[in-house]
Amino acid sequence: MNESKLLSPNGIVKASALCLLMSAFSVNAAFAVPVLDREVMVIQQGRTLTGTVVDNFGDPVIGANVIVKGTTIGNITDVNGTFTVENVPDDAVLQISYIGFKTLEVPVKGQTTFNITLQEDTENLQEVVVVGYGSSVKKDLTTAVTSVSSKDFLAGAVNDPMQMVDGKVAGVVVNSVAAADPNKSGSIQVRGASSLKAGNSPLIVIDGMPGGDLRNLAQSDIESITVLKDGSAAAIYGSRGANGVILVTTKQGKAGKTTITYDGYVEHDFVASKPDVLDADAYLDKVTGAVDYGHRTNWYDELINKNNFGHNHNISLSGGSETTIFRMSANFKGKEGLDIASDRKEYGLRGNFKHTTLEGLLEVGGNFSYRIADEDYTDYASFKQAVQLNPTFSVDEMDAFKGNSYSFNPVKNLTEQENGAKQEYSTIDLNLKLNILKNLNTELKLGRQGHNKKQSQYKFKTHKDCINGNYNGYALLKQEAWTDWTLEWLGNYSFKINDEHDFKIMGGYSYQQFDYEWFSASNRDFPSDAFLYNYLQGGEYEKVNGRLGMESHKEEEKTIAFLGRINYNWNDVFLFTGSLRHEGNSKFGEDHKWGLFPAASAAWRVSKLPVFENSSAVDDLKLRFSYGVTGRSGFDRYTAQAKYSGFGQYYSDTYGKFIMGYGPGNNPNYDLAWEKQISYNLGIDYTLFNSRLSGSFDAFIREGRDVIGEYPVPLPPYLHDKIYANVGTTTSKGFEFQVNWDAVQTKDFSYSTNLNLAYTKSKLKSFSNEKYQLGYIEGDGFPSPGNPGSAQRLEDGIEIGSFYGFRYAGVDDAGNILIWEKGEEGGVTKLGADGNEQDKVYLDGTGVPKWELSWGNTFRYKDFDLSLFFRGRFRYKVMNQYEMYYGLQVVSGDNKLSSAYEENAHIKGPKVICDYFLQNGNYLRLDNITLGWTPKLNTKWISNLRVYGTLKNVFTLTKYSGVDPTTVTTTGLWPGIGGMEVYPTARNLTFGVQITY
């Protein structure tokens, strides 16, 4: 091994991480728990209990916790499943628990010997599911809610927590187009896109705090992720609930002995697929205008960090007594990107506690977290340049690109600059709960979420921008700060009438304030690169009068809400939930600050009918229907208000200096209100064959009203030619199907499978009225060279994601693309270069997958388990920019894809946006394969051990000729464009260990 590499900082970090991971196997220490005086009295007065704990196959359960409920007195079972607990009183209750089994409570009642059988925790109808401002037993849900617990998360390395449930929830799309970039998070969309200007991302709620940031979480700290999909479930969150709500619950402490858990892994990324570019010899042989500069460079490979390494370590401490429970964790995570520039290091602390006092009258609890992320960024433009650049240039070549804004050295573009950020995330909240009566309580919650980001960038004088701009260095410092304050006061009351009518009532008040500040300063032309971005005043550029190198900005938003909910259960047969939220928000127009968001849902437990009374097949069968009104408010703050803006500096003869000119910066709209969404959902939940088969089916319709758009207005009377107004209407329809089947269950072998299938179709019904008219909205134009225009358009009655362009009609004798005039196939043809608006039509297909599929399979043989997880998207198209720009021979001197001289060899002319480049995006991928070992250990110190290996992105079946179909955005308003600035797709290998002491 190269000694210099071994002793480098990077080498030391890698070696240390590996040592830490392996050292977890050799820990041999006990953790002592102090014994309370009250427990000493128990020891002096009780008796000795012995017993055996087995599973439903009669095998001993090794390492099960056996404790006296409400105390820390207890023991764990040995290799034979036996236990001994001394000095236990006759009226005590034993609590037996083990991972993967249902917790069991057994009264002592004077016994001294126990034979205990634990049941596997499969589909538990009594499972408690978190919902908005509360929780519910799973079997009593009346809305479309899906919860994924930590035991069902996808294994392996992730950039953000939602990747652990990607494909696990029908109707939820997690679009990770650059999964191997450590600083990139995926976009999330629930049941399609419906908004033009107010956002399509769901609300994130972490431990009850709305507006949370998922990157403030270590994946090992998450207990469950719950998605509120329909309007009735999300309406309790008012103007932020229309895009769905994601509730994240972190792990909490449990009463009993204190446990220490280590959860860690190491990982490595491989390039899974890359563009098929001509090598240097093929380039010189085939490309017109090719020039040989004497080198043989694979630009794409030069950008890849083949020795990338990632590691993640989480240590947690958890435990408690009858009155106090706690959990604390520390996390360190480091990941190098698949490219030579990107990197990320994270350090985090998280803790929570709950203390009950005054004989249960008062509960005090809280959460805190602090996380630092040190980020180094990359530039995706380098990967675009790596495809088109002459492969005979030297890796160090710079002079050839002077004054050329089109071509640059992609390697130097990354190495000749420092670009990154330091981010701090913090959360603290305190909860006070007063249990006035057994069925009446009130809770006060105060919380603060903070996020600070300091971005710094320095381009050396050898960077392409500095060379072309003729200045020595460029520096930028940018600071952003987000602060969210939350105050909530809730009350809960429950009562029963004649043991048949069960009522639960919740009412509350919510206040939330969002503050945002932003500051940016830049300069250029420095005497030296040595100071980087730490010497802004040294640059000469901003010293010239009339040049302003600083900007600052501040925003504030407030939300106040009064909310209530009632749950009614008649004899466990008929269930009803109704909720109402009255909310005011400072973002809206002066005359529309307040909104009302009602919701209602009902369910009928069909399995209670006499026909199912003695059925051995039907455990639970429930039909439900829901209606809800939600809102959407994700547009920019102050859009409704009048704003003044600077319009440049002007020299004043009167004052002898430059003075900033100000004027109205927009057209205010005091009638601007929240977007409304009316949702209907019909669903069925089923559990069959002693919980072996379970699942759900949902059909939904969502109607968007008062959708915000930007509309042209006349000058005068308006001061500007555009205004924001509530005009549009949208619709989304679809259905979702989920099924879980424990197919085989024997003593040594089991097999379970689950399938999720979702169909979604979204359409823009209209976005014009008598006052505001807008014919259509064009998507983003394609990049230079040339001006090919846009490939997508939004128009009344057209599906979101529709493609718009020419119909391909072949080529002429010179190899120029021909199109059908007026889009009429079989009619008159013309040159694509001569095409006009009259020749454009809506092309077949959209960029939104109609079908989303996931299929999970888990096999267990004795102590080993194997899981395979497949994902797929179907019935959608992709406009392949790679083929359009690099798969044609027309641009002289640029490198090409091999397809330019193979599949596309007949095309010699310029690119044209037509359906020739519109490809089938369908794919099926073996996304995750995990092999794990969970041995039954013969040790008193280690209660649980799991070792696993995960391979992600194993293979992909697709006809798409681009780099990878998953690099194409399929969410938002403009899905299905296969861009060129594409980060490499990775195949990830992870080895991990989980140990509980």
Residue ranges, per PLM feature:
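Extracellular/periplasmic, surface-exposed regions of secreted and cell-surface proteins
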Residues: 153, 201, 207, 284, ...
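Short, small/polar-rich motifs associated with maturation and membrane association
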Residues: 1-358, 362-367, 371, 402, ...
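Glycine-rich, aromatic-lined ligand/substrate-binding cores of catalytic
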Residues: 846-878
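Acidic, glycine-rich flexible loop segments
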Residues: 382-410
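Conserved small-residue
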Residues: 261-295, 520, 524, 725, ...
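C-terminal beta-barrel architecture of Gram-negative outer-membrane proteins
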Residues: 866-926
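Exposed, low-structure sequence patches enriched in small/polar residues
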Residues: 445, 508, 565-567, 623, ...
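Extracellular/lumenal ectodomain signal focusing on beta-strand-rich modules
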Residues: 63, 87, 115, 127, ...
